[in-house]
C-alpha cells in the first residue's frame, strides 16, 4: 500500500508546499555489495511511461556543477537521480526539494522553476542516504525493494516476457489501470507513513561509521545498566578493531555512538561522573525501563 501511494504521489502534479520531500528507492539488504537488480530501475522506467521524467546518473553527479540540470525543462515532472554514490551530500539537494530548481543550459539564460512547478525529486541507491536531523528526515520518503529479483531471478524469468517491450495492448491497459488506481488511492489517503526496516538502519550505520563500529556497538549494547566512560569505550573499540587514533578519532567515535543509537533506537543514558574525574560516561538502558518511564 505504501508503494501504491508513492506511485500516486509521483504521478500527480500537486506538491504540498508545507511538506516538501524526496522519494528514495533503497534496498532491503544489509550489504550494499549484494545490491542491484531488485527493480528500482524498472520502477523509474514505469513512471516514465506516464510522466515527463528526466533520468540522471548519480554516480558522479554534483549538484553544484554547471549545467547539472540542463536536461530539465518546464514540463519535467520527475527528476530521478539514479545510483547515487555512498555518503552523498543530501543537504546539497535541500533547495531543489523545498524551493525550486535553477536550470542552466549552454548559451542560454538561467531559468528558475519555482517549487510548485518544479519536478519531484527521486533518488535510487544501493547504499543509504544520510538523514540525521529532523530536516533530513522530513525531506525523505524511503521505499525499500526486497531481494526477490536479482541476478539469478529477473522479471523476464518470472513473467515470461520483457516488461514494457513485449507488452500487447491488453497488458498496457492493465498497467495504465494500475497506475491510475495508484493516483486515486493517493488522492484519497495521501502518502502512508511506514517505518524503515532494521536492515536499512544497520546499513546506514555501516555506511556512515564502518562495519567494525557496527559490530562493536552491537556487542556493547548488551552490557546493560553499567556506567562506562566514553574514553574506556573508545580504547576498547581501538583495541578490538586495530584502528589507530589518527584513523578513527575520539570525535568521530562519539558522533558514531550518538547517531547510531538514534538510528538503531538503542536506549542509553549519558552523564558527567564525579567518580570518573567529571568525564563523560554512558550506559545502555533496558528498553522496557525506558517505556515504563515514558
Task: Put a short name on every predicted segment.
Residues 1-75, 141-143, 179, 184, ...:
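P-loop NTPase catalytic core of nucleic-acid-dependent motor ATPases
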Residues 2-6, 20, 38-46, 88-92, ...:
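Generic recognition of stable, solvent-exposed alpha-helical segments in well-folded globular domains
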Residues 19, 24-25, 72-75, 141, ...:
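Short acidic (Asp/Glu) and glycine-rich catalytic loops that position anionic groups and cofactors
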Residues 56, 169-211:
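Phosphate-handling catalytic cores of nucleic-acid transaction enzymes
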Residues 58-67, 87-90, 106-111, 118-119, ...:
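Positively charged interface segments
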Residues 71-73, 97, 103, 111-116:
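Catalytic core segments in nucleotide and nucleic-acid processing enzymes
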Residues 75-78, 117-121:
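Loop/turn-to-beta-strand initiation segments
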Residues 76-99, 130-136:
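Conserved AAA+/SF3 P-loop NTPase catalytic/coupling segment centered on the Walker-B
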Amino acid at each position: 500500500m505504501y508503494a501504491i501511494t508513492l506511485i500516486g504521489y509521483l504521478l500527480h502534479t500537486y506538491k504540498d508546499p508545507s511538506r516538501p520531500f524526496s522519494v528514495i528507492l533503497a534496498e532491503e539488504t544489509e550489504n550494499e555489495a549484494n545490491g542491484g537488480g531488485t527493480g528500482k530501475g524498472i520502477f523509474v522506467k514505469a513512471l516514465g511511461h506516464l510522466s515527463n521524467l528526466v533520468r540522471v546518473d548519480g554516480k558522479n553527479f554534483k549538484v553544484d556543477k554547471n549545467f547539472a540540470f540542463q536536461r530539465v525543462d518546464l514540463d519535467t515532472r520527475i527528476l530521478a537521480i539514479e545510483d547515487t554514490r555512498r555518503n552523498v551530500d543530501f543537504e546539497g539537494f535541500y533547495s531543489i526539494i523545498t524551493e525550486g530548481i535553477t536550470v542552466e543550459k549552454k548559451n542560454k539564460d538561467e531559468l528558475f522553476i519555482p517549487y510548485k512547478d518544479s519536478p519531484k525529486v527521486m533518488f535510487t541507491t544501493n547504499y543509504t542516504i544520510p538523514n540525521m536531523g529532523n530536516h533530513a528526515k522530513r525531506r525523505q520518503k524511503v521505499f525499500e525493494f526486497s531481494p526477490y529479483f536479482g541476478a539469478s531471478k529477473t522479471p523476464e524469468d518470472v513473467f515470461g516476457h520483457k516488461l514494457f517491450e513485449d507488452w500487447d495492448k491488453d497488458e498496457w491497459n492493465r498497467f495504465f489501470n494500475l497506475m491510475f488506481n495508484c493516483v486515486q488511492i493517493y488522492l484519497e489517503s495521501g502518502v502512508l507513513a511506514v517505518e524503515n526496516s532494521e536492515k536499512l538502519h544497520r546499513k546506514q550505520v555501516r555506511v556512515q561509521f564502518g562495519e567494525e563500529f557496527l559490530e562493536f556497538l552491537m556487542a556493547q549494547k548488551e552490557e546493560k545498566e553499567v556506567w562506562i566512560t566514553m574514553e574506556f569505550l573508545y580504547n576498547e573499540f581501538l583495541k578490538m578493531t586495530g584502528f589507530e587514533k589518527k584513523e578513527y578519532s575520539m570525535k568521530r567515535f562519539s558522533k558514531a555512538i550518538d547517531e547510531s543509537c538514534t538510528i538503531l533506537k538503542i536506549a542509553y543514558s549519558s552523564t558527567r561522573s564525579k567518580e570518573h574525574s567529571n568525564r563523560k560516561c554512558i550506559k545502555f538502558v533496558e528498553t522496557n525501563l525506558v517505556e515504563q518511564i515514558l
